């Protein structure tokens, strides 16, 4: 796997990730989240049609159900879910973080009870890598401890240094396997800890680097200051992945600072709650004002949903709890995110990213009438 930066506008990077099989992902890119080997409600063909180039799978959930062995028997996650474009799998670290009240964390790994059937599970860096090898995703992640917010300096330091030790164990377990292992920078909101983490991971010479431990409750300005502090220490010739950060404005600010890859459940989860993203801000479809509104969600949008259906119809589907409503909303929200990344790539190519960002914020403030 190679990363090629084709042009920059300030710190914003327009590049591409070239995989060993010849597949190419244009960056900056948003990765829809397919937690259970599916992006909820959509077929792989629908994902492809709306422009998704790479998706994310969840190691934690797939390990527990159906199990890595079943997916491996299909030939891997691509064949299991019939998605032929690249897949990135996370390590399970964030899900372990979310089980804070019922898990025990040690140097060896994380011990917890399965939220599915209650059986005890022991997840180590080596086990996470083995599961991801069985899933056979294109990009795999080291197991890390997602540092909570708030955390004291000492708590963040101890957590970050254990994640570094786990990164070394992950690399050793990975060996020369064909998948591409990314390291995860931790350190809370402490700039010196983030820099220490990044510099130590760079010594491992991994194919890519993720910024983890953000979008866990910290203020927006603290998140952006953390990115400003750490990104100069992350190699320019490798892809940079900001994990779990997903509001549209967060994507713009991440790209502005040199991030190449994003993922978040927000567009698909919000779609199922009739909370829709548009060029002019949020549209809350459950509002009664949309009962008789004949316009599409966004008159500037070319997605399948906006080209065919009215706000009134989608409002009706939501009121009736019809599955089609959630599906059409998800198509729109994911198209919005994918198209936003396309617009940012073009703005970087044309060296007008700052103008794009100003227009983005101005339009978002207009609101939907």
UniProtKB/Swiss-Prot annotation:
Listed EC numbers: 2.4.2.29
Pathway: tRNA modification; tRNA-queuosine biosynthesis
Keyword set includes tRNA processing: yes
Gene Ontology cellular component terms for the protein in this record: cytosol
Cofactor(s), names only, from the UniProt record: Zn(2+)
Domain of life from the UniProt record: Bacteria
Binding site for Zn(2+): 301, 303, 306, 332
Region (RNA binding): 244-250
Binding site for substrate: 90-94, 144, 186, 213
Single GO MF annotation: tRNA-guanosine(34) queuine transglycosylase activity
InterPro entries: ArchSynthase1/Queuine_TRR, TGT, TGT-like_sf, tRNA_ribo_trans-like
Note on cofactor: Binds 1 zinc ion per subunit.
This protein's record includes keyword Metal-binding: yes
HAMAP family referenced in this protein's UniProt entry, alphabetically: Q_tRNA_Tgt
Role this protein plays: Catalyzes the base-exchange of a guanine (G) residue with the queuine precursor 7-aminomethyl-7-deazaguanine (PreQ1) at position 34 (anticodon wobble position) in tRNAs with GU(N) anticodons (tRNA-Asp, -Asn, -His and -Tyr). Catalysis occurs through a double-displacement mechanism. The nucleophile active site attacks the C1' of nucleotide 34 to detach the guanine base from the RNA, forming a covalent enzyme-RNA intermediate. The proton acceptor active site deprotonates the incoming PreQ1, allowing a nucleophilic attack on the C1' of the ribose to form the product.
Family affiliation: Belongs to the queuine tRNA-ribosyltransferase family.
Assembly, per entry: Homodimer. Within each dimer, one monomer is responsible for RNA recognition and catalysis, while the other monomer binds to the replacement base PreQ1.
Protein name as it appears in the record: Queuine tRNA-ribosyltransferase
